[in-house]
Amino acid sequence: MSTVSKLQFGDDWPFTREEVMLNCRADGAWFVINPATLMQYPLNEIAMKQMESGKVKAQLIDVILLPDPNAPEKKKSVEVIQNAIKLLCESN
């Protein structure tokens, strides 16, 4: 598990919170965790399936995503966060 913040990602930061925790699980599921509430948000397909099946308590990540400034009807991309968690998972 690792904490990341807006300071590290600048304008690419996709979240409404200033910092979040990234959790890379042994089964390959990736979750973003809100440190204030400990709510989990799935970041990949494995995590999404676990949420949908009720295996884990989580919410859709859209809840904590900022609007895309170039397309306000859409949410910001989480690609930079997915890249960061991939590196985290590979190093553990």
PLM regions: where:
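C-terminal partner/receptor-binding element of secreted or periplasmic proteins
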Residues: K55-N92
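Mature extracytoplasmic domains of secretory-pathway proteins
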Residues: T3, Q8-K57
